[in-house]
Amino acid sequence: MATSGRLLCVCLVLGLVFGSLGYPVMEKKRAGKNFDLGTIANWAWQIGEKGGEIIDAIGTSNVPCGDGTCQFGCCEDDRCEDLGCDTFSSS
């Protein structure tokens, strides 16, 4: 009985150790992933008022980000992310 208890404890500890080495459960939250179409439509209206680019009806184009615009889903803390995101200068 004592051997099976020790074996169980070793298995639990190894499971915790190797489980913590795996991929993180929560992925990095990117601004734009959780916006609804109402927010996107509001942005499109604001950009349309300024004469800039208008966002597609689905919201797959560019959004205002800080001083300019950037690809939808790439704006974080009023800055466009660098990797895999196109940046556009404001007009």
Curated annotation (Swiss-Prot):
GO terms for cellular component: extracellular region. Residues 22-50 form a propeptide. One of its GO terms (molecular function) is toxin activity. Keywords: Disulfide bond, Secreted, Signal, Toxin. The keyword Cell cycle does not apply. The keyword Chaperone does not apply. Residues 1-21 form the signal peptide. The cysteine framework is VI/VII (C-C-CC-C-C). This is Teretoxin Tan6.2.
